[in-house]
Amino acid sequence: MPPRILLSLTLLLSACAQPLPPLPADLVRVALDSGTRADMRAYRLDGELVRQLRFPDLPPGTHELQVRYQFEVPGGMGGLGQLSEPRRRTCILGIEGELSAGEHYRVTAYRLGWQPVGYLEDAAGERLVRASVIRCGPGV
């Protein structure tokens, strides 16, 4: 591989691996955790579309967070009695909660059958608010 391409690739990959800067004491950080075989992305913050994968650091107060959660569900019976491949299901989950300055929070989600279950947790992992399912299906 030519050195220029190798250097460019190294710089590109190292930019993705940068740790987040320390959280200022007057802001709130919300991380996303979807576990394995699933994907969670920031969708809306206080009604406004988020154009990043995660939420920006927020001022303290009450916020409405929405995430797009995509997870695998088992396939059904295909033709000739064979099991079909697992399918991806996409849902929008909403959480409204009071966030305190200087704190780290995490939105977690998992699937329970065909339905998602999500929570807002504090830094210690204590569940604070259960997420509501806003909608699921194609085009979400």
Please report, for each region that a protein language model flagged, where it lies by residue.
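Sec-dependent bacterial lipoprotein signal peptides
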Residues: 1-17
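Short loop/turn and low-complexity linker motifs enriched in small/turn-promoting residues
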Residues: 16-140
